[in-house]
């Protein structure tokens, strides 16, 4: 059988049951893609485009908070091991999708995502 996971009303990820040994190498590739986007590509784009958030850890915070619609550390163990390694396969897919979309994002969208992320923490962009 096939399973479908919805990212939004228009985006779907098709998931087929696979043995764990088949998923593990693929998972590592997805994690590496997430790190390359959030630690290298997006910070470079952020600086060039004048995003209000440019540090890699802030970009990761925005992405993770957006996929949970809450502080990510309310859903994952903070500090035990990297958050991206704790994501379910579906949440990792959502994080990658959002990170890819951020490559084309306007500073206004990033400003909004950052404000949402900070509001989950009861902070404002000036804090």
Pin down the residues of each PLM region.
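Positively charged, phosphate-engaging catalytic surfaces used for nucleic-acid and nucleotide handling
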Residues: 1-127
